[in-house]
Amino acid sequence: MRLIHTVAELREEIALAKAQNLTIGLVPTMGALHEGHASLITAANRENDFVVVSVFVNPTQFGPNEDLDAYPRTLEADCKLAEEKGANVVFAPSPKEMYPSEDDTWVEVTGDVTKVLCGRTRPIHFRGVTTVVTKLFNLAQPDRAYFGQKDAQQVEVLKRMVKDLFFPLELRVMPIIREKDGLAKSSRNTYLNESERTAALVLSRSLKAAKEMYAAGERDAEKIIAAVTEGIKAEPMSNIDYVEIYALPELKPIANPLKGSNLLAVAVKFGTTRLIDNVVLEEEE
């Protein structure tokens, strides 16, 4: 496996792969890799001949007073995990490499999909995501790109971008990977102290209860939201940002009673750490 830091080096690697007619899988990450990322790299390795993992803490998707400086940076460990899971290249550029101009060019998806949920409290976040992912798509020219369902809103935004900008690639979405006790794997889990970590288990418990309500026939969105909200509020260390349901795809307003496929998403703070989690409510096949 090769660790590279420049656009020129990545272009060289991609040109060589293309010359051999290799299929390319891209796994964009912000580093601090965990088992969730590992599942993406494993899938990319299984489905493609050549795998690029990008490790870049993208400054443009962090707002003021967010955790850009505190975000964990563990490049050596990231490279080890990426190599173990079958990556051919780790691309770890500097901010200057990815944003060479004084003034930036932006790729922005508009509409409900970027305005609801995290878009309300993090207004510049998705513009930063779509811009950096566009750059990575242009550089790596992947046949397939891999993202996790944990970032469900990001996935919907990127699906829309891929469709609207005619990117010739397949967006592959992999299931949420959880700890044994149910907590969704996240690089930000490292911020939690022991009591916050225990408190955070209320997220997966409440979402599981919602899924059980839905399976038992409950279709009233307000009742499901109320039950999840009540469940989370029962944990005194929790501070709810949102508990909401939107229709899939593209996070449209829901029909009530619920029908089709819907995303139940939560964002909750434990201490200073904001965690997100979600579950899809739909008829079982």
Which functions belong to the PLM regions below?
Residues 2-237, 246-250, 280:
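Nucleotidyltransferase catalytic core that binds NTPs
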Residues 227-285:
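Phosphate/ribose-recognition catalytic cores of enzymes acting on nucleotide-derived substrates
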